[in-house]
């Protein structure tokens, strides 16, 4: 009989393991290679295996990123949420094991009971004082988890904890990218500001020259007004760049979370900001294991499926066990002795019979949440694929834009120099010189913006490929 009981309990335990759906990663249509990706270059490196201090070479940028990871308020919230989720998981996991308590009591009581003739003379009651001492170790309402309810609660809490850890890593990676992109935008704006300041000075000189020529009668009012208009345009653009620089600097201070060091390290030129070897795109399937946001979405799906097991277990009886063992005696001396030993044990069963569809509705909610988690996982994967594809396309076509714009700037610089020479020779008028200089200024500004976009795109590629997530170093 005991053997049959053990077999039955084992069968129930195995059945309990089947209440939660088996976790399987949703299948998504993927391609072998990202669209528009170039062939891997010799010496290319895997982004997920490069720590951010190795990828970003500028010492000032590294200082800013390190400060942001320490002081950024959103980062601090993400870290605290990890601690919260860890605590919740420990609470749930502790419910899988019995809670053992120690009870000790000493009771002294007086009782009045009906007595005999002598007692009647004293009022009909006889009294006595009694003492009772006890010490017991017991287990209170330990649930025998035949159906896996407590185990699935623990599994769901564990998955939520792991999802929170990955969400914190995803935010950390995003913060690194935001700080780097903002810093590079500031450095680019500083270069554009210097170019704009130089252009404004040149435009002011041209206005003075045009005024002298106008007063001397060798230039027209059209030439003078054209010079003034170009000066106004340059000054307007200078103000726009200053506004952009101020906003980007304010945003960087917000990201860093504190006042930056008053004496930061010397920065590197923009063309030496990043690691020189090209980043390898890798296979799309590898992204599932390197992007923390994808891993977090899968853990949330795992938690949703564990909660289905919890909801299904509610249809079965909950069996709890309460027991204790110890000693009890009317005298304190000799309390812990064999003749004073006591024990008790007893199971309890709880099963709601009528709940007006509450358990069925709870199961429906759990299944709906699983479907939501599947959709969110698929959406996260698709968004990640798109981010990588966009960054790869940007790497390819921004390089083409940069090469063409550099050639355009060289051509326009030659035109501006020739216009100056031919103006000195009297072949062209001053308006043609101004037009050549304006075209060169616009082209140089565009070149700086393309270089900035190229750097920001490389940062986006590093982030979208899960940069540093498998490096195993402190980030």
Predicted features, each with a name:
Residues 78-92, 171, 175-198, 202-212, ...:
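Amphipathic alpha-helical coiled-coil segments
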Residues 90-91, 111-114, 236-239, 261-262:
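Secretory-pathway/luminal and periplasmic proteins that interact with or process carbohydrate-rich
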Residues 71-72, 216, 425:
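Charged, alpha-helical scaffolding/interaction elements associated with membrane systems
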Residues 99-101, 221, 251, 318-320, ...:
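Residues at or immediately flanking beta-strands
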Residues 2-70, 118-120, 158, 242-289, ...:
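Terminal intrinsically disordered/low-complexity segments used for targeting and assembly
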Residues 220, 259, 428-429:
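Short coil/turn motifs that cap or connect alpha-helices
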Residues 215-244, 446:
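Repeat-solenoid scaffold signature
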Residues 19-26, 50-51, 57-66, 71, ...:
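Small/polar-residue-enriched beta-strand and adjacent coil segments characteristic
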């Amino acid at each position: 009989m005991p053997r049959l009981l053990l077999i039955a309990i084992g069968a129930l335990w195995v059945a309990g393991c089947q209440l939660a759906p088996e976790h399987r990663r949703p299948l998504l249509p993927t391609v072998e290679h990202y669209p528009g990706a170039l062939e891997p270059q010799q010496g290319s490196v895997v982004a997920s295996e490069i720590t951010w201090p190795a990828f970003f070479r500028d010492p000032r940028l590294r200082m800013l990123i390190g400060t942001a990871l320490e002081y950024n308020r959103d980062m601090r919230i993400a870290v605290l949420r990890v601690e919260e989720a860890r605590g919740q998981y420990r609470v749930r996991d502790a419910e899988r094991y019995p809670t053992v308590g120690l009870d000790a009591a000493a009771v002294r009581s007086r009782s009045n009971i009906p007595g005999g003739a002598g007692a009647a003379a004293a009022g009909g009651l006889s009294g006595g004082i009694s003492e009772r001492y006890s010490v017991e170790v017991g287990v209170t309402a330990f649930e025998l988890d035949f159906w896996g309810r407590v185990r699935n609660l623990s599994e769901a809490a564990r998955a939520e904890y792991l999802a929170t850890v990955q969400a914190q890593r995803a935010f950390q990676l995003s913060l690194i990218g935001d700080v780097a992109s903002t810093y590079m935008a500031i450095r680019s704006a500083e270069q554009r500001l210097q170019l704009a300041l130089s252009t404004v000075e040149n435009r002011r000189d041209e206005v003075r020259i045009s005024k002298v020529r106008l007063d001397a009668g060798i230039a027209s009012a059209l030439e003078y007004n054209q010079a003034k208009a170009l000066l106004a345009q340059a000054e307007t653009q200078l103000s726009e760049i200053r506004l952009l620089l101020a906003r980007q600097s304010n945003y960087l201070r917000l990201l860093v979370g504190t006042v930056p060091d008053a004496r930061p390290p010397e920065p590197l030129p923009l063309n030496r900001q990043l690691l020189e070897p090209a980043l390898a795109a890798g296979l799309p399937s590898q992204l599932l294991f390197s992007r923390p946001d994808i891993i977090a979405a899968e853990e949330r799906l795992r938690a949703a499926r564990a909660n289905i097991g919890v909801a299904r277990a509610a249809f079965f009886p909950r069996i709890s066990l309460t027991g204790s063992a110890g000693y009890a005696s009317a005298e304190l001396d000799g309390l812990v002795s064999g003749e004073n030993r006591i024990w008790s044990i007893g199971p309890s069963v709880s099963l709601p019979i009528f709940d007006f569809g509450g358990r069925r509705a709870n199961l429906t909610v759990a299944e709906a949440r699983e479907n939501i988690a599947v959709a969110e996982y698929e959406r996260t994967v698709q968004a990640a694929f798109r981010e990588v594809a966009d960054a790869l396309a940007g790497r390819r076509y921004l390089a083409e834009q940069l090469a063409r714009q550099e050639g355009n700037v060289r051509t326009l610089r030659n035109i501006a120099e020739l216009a100056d020479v031919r103006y000195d020779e009297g072949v062209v008028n001053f308006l043609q010189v101004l037009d050549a200089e304006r075209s060169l200024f616009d082209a140089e500004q565009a070149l700086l913006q393309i270089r900035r976009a190229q750097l920001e795109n490389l940062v986006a590629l590093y982030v979208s490929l899960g940069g540093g997530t498998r490096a195993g170093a402190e980030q």
